[in-house]
Swiss-Prot record:
Keywords: DNA damage, DNA repair. It comes from Geobacter sp. (strain M21). InterPro entries: DNA_mismatch_repair_CS (IPR014762), DNA_mismatch_repair_MutL (IPR020667), DNA_mismatch_S5_2-like (IPR013507), HATPase_C_sf (IPR036890), MutL/Mlh/PMS (IPR002099), MutL/Mlh/Pms-like (IPR038973), MutL_C (IPR014790), MutL_C_dimsub (IPR042120). This is DNA mismatch repair protein MutL. The gene is mutL. One of its GO terms (cellular component) is mismatch repair complex.
Length: 650
């Protein structure tokens, strides 16, 4: 009887093994760059073509390999990094399994060129599909150059799952970002289709993080340094205002190895729990140094997950380290120093909002200020330098200029009576109203509307009582008390408006008078480059400025008066999560809802009767007005019976 179990041929086992190690071009780059760092390289250059499908080339200045070692490196489970099973628990290198090169070679056309310092000439090896085809001598500098061409040429099924060149190039860039942050003393260069995407010179950690994640974040980074027994926690943490909508900027390392460990991430999030809203994630680069025997890194093919011997101790140490920095709120001190450095201005006092009307009136004096007359007590005129000093400080001029540039007059309805009359409060009454009672929105608003006999909608028919906590509008309809969340209501109106514009062609965009320069991380920049057309439909107009710097030339009209930078970063996070099974069309409403949410005032705001009436009119013209785009209710109703029950009247 023939056996059903058979030994698989070597070429098939190699492809199966390669499937665990080589998932995409970024996986190849990871293995090769980690080998370069283990070899002591002080400079690493990574070049790709067609997203890595055509070429992945890694050049380093490490120790190189002899001819015999280079040939052995292509054999499975051949490595110089471990020799016994005890070595698995004292690892000081990034690689140790001896699988990388043979796995990559089995699914590509691979060339290795390498030379050691004690060799006159180097060795070049060419392998195709895991089989060595040619070995020869070559001239080169000390180090190693590995070229991987035609990745997955012999595994077409795997080739089908590769994404666009832009996406794959973005994954390679993100991989290099992680490695570059872990080794700030090593120079990194990344080229994509001949174009230099970034070049990171050797520097300290703060400079390296700023290079990789954007200069705008550098002034919001604060050092962490904590030691407890044999456990050391160091690195940088960012202020809460730099937070992201996903955990893509949590750069955590164990003994120099990038990891995505739940214990480590939970400790960091716990430290930030009192500083961030739910669903927001901090920007950190945290390094944990621990005895190799206290952590097992050999628990996952990608080595991104680890297992600690004393999990609770590590968790608590990380949380304490980050909390020790955050509890000092250094970003507030920075703001105070910046405020103190500005010259004091006349009439200064408690901070107050600077209204648009004030901005329009804040012009420089037309006539010069009168100079003091010369008197016997002041025989000499003021020095010439003093006469040439500006009448208004430069910071004040810049502030006014910015307000005038961003000033947009709020559209006002036609003038009309807004109150039936006013009832003077009784003398000495503690319940004096803020303003006279407004006319219910259901009342006729003009003679033109009276002649048209326009029937008021549900919201416009409500009798407005007032506002509670500058966040909720209290209304009455019959004997019912109705509470309306003004933020949720405004958000629904903005969302439906955006959805209508997007269905037509694109969201109305507001051009910026002065384009804003924005620096992104490599991952964000790659996502932006790939989805630039979709972002244009959403109202964001970008122009590439070089490297990871972009010019923002237009934003959706609804965002023009808000902080749109955070909105853009959140949208890029959302777009970065797209996969083959999740297209842009699947998340377009989520993105519109995010824009709508960021476009409305989140905090407390006192509304005038005119603004309330305008909001209610828009709500009557809006579909699904009972809920905001995130599903939260816009209104709640309390019947008279429920109110009387509260006071035990029934």
């Amino acid at each position: 009887m023939a056996t059903k179990i058979r030994i698989l041929p070597e070429n098939l086992t190699n492809k199966i093994a390669a499937g665990e190690v080589v998932e995409r071009p970024a996986s190849v780059a990871k293995e090769l760059v980690e080998n370069a760092l283990d070899a002591g390289s002080k400079e690493v250059v990574v070049e790709i073509e067609s997203g890595g499908r055509r070429l992945i080339k890694v050049s380093d200045t490490g120790c190189g390999m002899s001819r015999d070692d280079a040939l052995l490196a292509l054999e499975r489970h051949a490595t110089s990094k471990i020799a016994t099973d005890e070595d698995l628990f004292s690892l000081c290198t990034l690689g140790f399994r001896g699988e990388a090169l043979p796995s990559v070679a089995s699914v590509s056309r691979l060339t290795i060129s390498t030379r050691t310092s004690d060799s006159v000439e180097g060795t070049e090896i060419y392998a195709e599909g895991g089989r060595i085809k040619e070995v020869k001598e070559c001239g080169m500098a000390v180090g190693t150059v590995i070229s991987v061409r035609n990745l997955f040429f012999n595994t077409p099924a795997r080739l089908k799952f590769m994404k666009s060149a832009e996406t794959e190039g973005g994954h390679v860039g993100e991989l290099l970002t992680r490695l570059a942050i872990s080794r700030p003393e090593v120079r990194f260069t990344y080229k994509n289709d001949g174009k230099v995407m970034f070049r990171a010179l050797d520097a300290d950690l703060k400079e390296r993080v700023a290079t990789m994640l954007g200069r705008s974040i550098s002034s919001f980074l604060y050092p962490v340094s904590y030691q407890e027994g044999g456990l050391k926690v160091s690195g940088l943490v960012a202020a809460p205002e730099c937070s992201r909508s996903a955990g893509s900027h949590l750069y955590t390392y164990i003994n120099g190895r990038f990891i995505k460990d739940k214990v480590v991430q939970h400790a960091i999030l716990q430290a930030y729990r009192n500083f961030l809203e739910r669903g927001r994630y901090p920007v950190v680069a945290v390094f944990i140094d621990i005895a190799p025997g206290e952590v097992d890194v050999n628990v996952h093919p990608t080595k991104h997950e680890v297992r600690f011997r004393e999990q609770g101790r590590v968790h608590d140490a990380i949380q304490k380290a980050v909390e020790s920095v955050l509890k000092e709120t250094p970003w507030l001190k920075r703001s105070a120093v910046a405020a103190a450095s500005r010259p004091a201005e006349k009439g200064g006092g408690a901070l107050r909002p600077f209204s648009s009307m004030e901005a329009s009136q804040a012009a420089l004096p037309v006539t010069p200020q009168p100079r003091p007359a010369l008197t016997p007590g002041h025989p000499d005129p003021p020095p010439q330098a003093q006469l040439q000093q500006p009448l208004v400080s430069e910071s004040r001029v810049a502030e006014v200029r910015e307000l005038l540039v961003n000033f947009q007059p709020r559209p006002q309805p036609p003038l009309r009576p807004q109150y039936r009359g006013s009832v003077a409060p009784r003398e000495g009454s503690p319940y004096a109203p803020i303003a006279a009672a407004p006319v219910p929105a259901s009342e006729p608003q003009s003679a033109a509307q009276d002649s048209d006999h326009v029937a008021a909608g549900y919201f416009s028919s409500l009798g407005v009582i007032g506002q509670f906590n500058a966040s909720y509008i209290l209304c009455q309809r019959g004997t019912d008390l109705i509470l309306i969340d003004q933020h949720a209501a405004h958000e629904r109106v903005a969302f439906e408006k955006l959805k209508g514009q997007f269905a037509g062609r694109e969201v109305d965009s507001q051009g910026l008078l002065f384009p804003e320069t924005m620096e992104f991380s490599f991952r964000e920049s790659a996502v932006l480059r790939e989805h630039q057309a979709e972002l244009a439909r959403l109202g964001f107009e970008f122009e590439e400025f070089g490297g990871n710097t972009w010019l923002l030339k237009g934003v959706p009209q609804v965002l023009s008066a808000t902080r749109y930078v955070d909105t853009i970063r959140d949208i890029l996070e959302e777009l970065g999560s797209l996969s083959r099974s999740r297209a842009f069309s699947d998340i377009q409403e989520d993105l519109l809802a995010r824009i709508a949410c960021h476009s409305v005032v989140r905090g407390k705001r006192t509304l005038s009767p005119v603004e309330i009436a305008a909001l209610f009119k828009q709500m009557d013209e809006t579909d699904f007005s009972s809920n905001c785009p995130h599903g939260r209710p816009v209104m709640q109703t309390l019947t008279l019976a429920e109110v009387e029950k509260m006071f035990k009247r029934i």
